[in-house]
Regions:
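A short glycine-rich, Lys/Arg-flanked "PGG" loop and its adjoining helix->strand segment in the class I
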Residues: 151-163
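N-terminal, positively charged/glycine-rich alpha-helical extensions of SAM-dependent methyltransferases
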Residues: 2-35
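Conserved alpha-helix/loop element of class I SAM-dependent methyltransferases that forms part
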Residues: 46-63
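A short acidic, Gly/Pro-enriched loop at the edge of an enzyme's catalytic core
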Residues: 126-136
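A short SAM/SAH-binding and catalytic strip from SAM-dependent methyltransferases
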Residues: 135-149
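Class I SAM-dependent methyltransferase SAM/SAH-binding core
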Residues: 67-125
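Core SAM-dependent methyltransferase catalytic element
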Residues: 216-219, 224-240
Length: 240
């Protein structure tokens, strides 16, 4: 089994920078990392992040309209298409390189691309007709934003959801105490340094989104912890 380690995070933060040659962007952009993200995730996390992403996949089988925000290279997207042959999916992703990676993944897996609409847009500026999606997915994405940005983003996404929508999210977390907390803090410090340098990430630290989801009318139905509590998968349901 692969375990996150501060050493692996530090190597990612410092050793990988020299390999990425594109100029920096003044605003948050993952363009410089798109071609490298797959191997970076594999080295850093093995299959753990994908296990987090797909923990509650079975709950998506009856959904019809899905909103995937910050989907990246499409690892969750292909699994969603496999388990739900009728779902229509909107993927909002700011990075053109990530969209290209996701489209190539769909082609390799020979999945029905006609059921997927890619929209290249900053999530903070994206808008949708209210009440359209019965599934919202934010995997390893909300950790990119500061508290005041989440306060704007989450209600905006919730507005696009139906009254019976479910919200799946996977992300990192900081355990409450002990060596697990210190370990998570060391890893996250390295990760935020790396992504701030490489992507102009706006956030400097992790903001739990729970209170914003609750204020938007969602209730935590289930949470699974991974890797000594450093990662989690959540199932949120709208209370109606």
């Amino acid at each position: 089994m692969f375990y996150f380690s501060p050493l692996a995070a530090a190597r990612l933060a410092y050793g990988g920078i020299a390999q990425l040659k594109k100029p920096f962007s003044a605003s948050m952009s993952f363009d410089r990392l798109a071609a490298h993200y797959h191997w970076m995730e594999k080295i850093f996390a093995g299959g753990l992040m994908q296990r987090c992403r797909t923990t509650f996949l079975a709950h998506t089988k009856d959904r019809r309209h899905a909103l995937l925000i910050g989907e990246g290279t499409g690892k969750f997207l292909v699994e969603l298409l496999r388990v739900n042959p009728r779902i229509q999916i909107t993927c909002v992703e700011q990075c053109a390189g990530m969209i290209q990676q996701a489209q190539q993944r769909l082609a390799r897996e020979q999945l029905d691309v006609s059921r997927v609409s890619f929209q290249q847009m900053d999530a903070l500026r994206w808008t949708s007709p209210p009440g359209k999606f019965d599934l919202v997915v934010t995997n390893f994405f909300l950790d990119c934003f500061r508290s005041e940005q989440l306060q704007k983003l989450i209600p905006q996404l919730a507005e696009s959801a139906t009254d019976d929508a479910i919200w799946l999210l996977a992300d990192f977390r900081v355990p409450e105490a002990g060596w697990r907390r210190w370990r998570a803090g060391a890893i996250l410090a390295s990760l935020y340094l790396f992504f701030k340098l490489m992507t102009s990430l706006s956030a400097s630290w992790l903001t739990p989104p729970d209170k914003f989801l609750a204020n938007a009318g969602f209730k935590l139905s289930d949470r699974r912890l991974f890797n000594f509590g450093f990662a989690h998968a959540d199932l949120w349901m709208r209370e109606g």
